[in-house]
Amino acid sequence: MGKEADVEAGGVRDYEDPPPAPLVDIDELGRWSLYRAVIAEFVATLLFLYVTVATVIGYKHQTDASASGDDAACGGVGVLGIAWAFGGMIFILVYCTAGISGGHINPAVTFGLFLARKVSLVRAILYIVAQCLGAVCGVALVKGFQSSFYDRYGGGANELAAGYSKGTGLAAEIIGTFVLVYTVFSATDPKRNARDSHVPVLAPLPIGFAVFMVHLATIPVTGTGINPARSLGAAVVYNNSKAWSDQWIFWVGPFIGAAIAALYHQIVLRASARGYGSFRSNA
């Protein structure tokens, strides 16, 4: 391989890209570190869904005129508060679990990192299973603690809003997930970490903020999925026909968005420098 164009003045890079993860690493199944990471993903996704869905249910109850009277219109945390709940929980949970599992908490993030060879197929599958189970358990806790409100206020399920086509909903999920996964790649880039020593500590902040911003943009359209586990967990517990009929949007969209983000970061942003370096070395 040729030298990269992003070398420092002395010709030596001040960062090192980690080697790609093996596609299938059977030996990984014998390591406790894998199962510890899977447990961390399960618990983190459970907590994420519990807090966020409880926030959604609470907001809808506080703004219900039949329950809160004339003050309902001014009650609750509002869409801004819901977006903060999602973004804030991602910030907290990524910070807590990044050193154990990488802090994915989202099958779309796991899928994007798998395409970029950051995690093996075995780890990716186990993570996604753990995330989905954690999401179901988290929403089930909300229903258990707020059974009188849960079904009445929609169970926190993602559904395409009235007036929007399925294509619009799909596009919203693709773009929203692209923003999130692109932020994940940028915040965890080893090149960035080498330049700014504080970046590893602050990495959860832009990731959480990306989730917050995407929610502001897409809550009116789809309720904001950008996380298939979040959408599946709510659909399983709520078990409503509308939530199930729209469920494919919240899997296809995020996986497409994650794939585009992975390809953009790995091929356009990072590999272009290597290609330019190879061209120069062969000139």
Curated annotation (Swiss-Prot):
This is Aquaporin PIP2-5. Aquaporins contain two tandem repeats each containing three membrane-spanning domains and a pore-forming loop with the signature motif Asn-Pro-Ala (NPA). Belongs to the MIP/aquaporin (TC 1.A.8) family. PIP (TC 1.A.8.11) subfamily. A motif (NPA 1) lies at residues 106-108. GO terms for cellular component: plasma membrane. Keywords: Cell membrane, Membrane, Repeat, Transmembrane, Transmembrane helix, Transport. It is found in: Cell membrane. Induction: Circadian-regulation. Expression is higher during the light phase than during the dark phase. Down-regulated by chilling. Water channel required to facilitate the transport of water across cell membrane. May play a role in root water uptake. The keyword Cell inner membrane does not apply. InterPro entries: Aquaporin-like (IPR023271), Aquaporin_transptr (IPR034294), MIP (IPR000425), MIP_CS (IPR022357). Gene3D superfamilies: Glycerol uptake facilitator protein. A motif (NPA 2) lies at residues 227-229. It is a multi-pass membrane protein. GO terms for molecular function: water channel activity. NCBIfam families: MIP. Its main location: membrane. The chain crosses the membrane at residues 37-57, 74-94, 125-145, 167-187, 199-219, 249-269. Expressed in roots. The keyword Membrane applies. The gene is PIP2-5.
